Amino acid sequence: MANVVKGLLTTYASTAQVEGGYFFVVSGSGYSPKHDTSSYMFIGSVDAWLNDNDPPPPTQNQVVVKGVLKNMIAAKLITSSNMCPVVQRIDWTTGTVYDYYKDYEDMFTRDEYKKLTKLFYVRNRFDQIFKCLYNNNGGQSTVEPILQPGTTQPGQTLILSDGYKWIYVTTIDKGLKKNFFDDSWMPLTVGQARADSTKPAGLGEVNAINVSTRGNNYTNGTDTTIVTITGDGRGAKAYANVYNRQIQDIIVTEPGNNYTYATVTVTVPAGYPGANAVAIPIVSPVGGHGSDPISELGCDRLMISVELNGAEGGKIPTNISFRQVGIVVNPQLKTGAIPTGTIYNTTDLCYVTFGTGSYQSGEQVYQGANLNSASFIGKVCSWDSSNNILHLINTQGTHTLGEAIIGATSGTTRVSVQYDESEIAIGSGYLMYVENRSPVQRSPNGNEQLRLVLSF
């Protein structure tokens, strides 16, 4: 079955940010009543969709939100090691025409699926990330940009034989790759890097100059023209390569610093011919290329990656399929406290006597004369036939020990001998994010790497 996922970042995320910003200014801290103190990734919902191959998109009306919280099966703590900023994965592929970075254009325009419309950076086979500074006037990229691993520095420029110019930005951390790298996304390291005008590049440096019009009648050579870079910065220098009596390329020898804009003119020494060449300088972001990869690559996604390890010490049933994954913030224990444990079973456990027949996943069970007049109703998340334990979700009414609990579909009848409510107060906390998925079948010996990508 295809792994179809449809997600929703709820308005909680926005209101929490607004309150956090308010309290940061007012009290000097980012704390607000909605601010994250304890966040958990949960799995839930055993009911089949009308079409399991095409689950419906989640909505956030209150009926749905409450239903999601009532159908939680288990929740696992999210720590800082479970989170990482990610950007769209763009692998270098030969024969592709890449866009190139232009400081005078918005590089982060997106399509209806929120994917970049300008593919101006790539990842190579060594997980090095480069920005394209020139695409040979719309030519195909046929030479992979690569720097010797272990010798990379942000801002290193490559001019390749296919006419492309690249500048090195960063390398994907091997430790992050295991949990935060997939077919669509790749991780970026969170550190102290930021757009910093006190760095050598200052407000910006000139890393490339691209020839848009080659001109004519120039004298072949590298010292037969004068390249002048003007702007509000200082120190940038370059020379032109001339052959076939045209400007073929302009090579930057000194990038200078503190440029917010620049222009280039090509003139000739007295007595030399040539005219009409036009060239456009490319000015870096504040601090220089590679000084702040998260902002330079337009990162607006946060991946949450949590692994469920089998039964998690008996906390999570393994004989189930789940169809929802999400994040709940600040749920409460039945005591009213904020939970701090790593893993919680959020189902009620009903221990029953030995007998015949098996309860069915997804069926309703009840106590009373019939389902319509029942004093207690629950939905079967899992039936542990080896230990005679029902895992129940979405319970209603008051459970009574010593009374029969009857399967509305299976007709199975056993007597309840012990009933343990979930430690988590069902319905508590804020639903931050939820995904409706095609069913994911758990197994006793299997692990699930659950990844959620939040878009801001």
Give the role of each language-model region.
Residues 1-140, 149-187, 320-351, 356-358, ...:
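Extended assembly-interface regions of large multimeric machines
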Residues 144:
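Acidic (Asp/Glu-rich), glycine- and aromatic
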Residues 159-456:
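Conserved, function-critical positions that sit in or immediately flank catalytic
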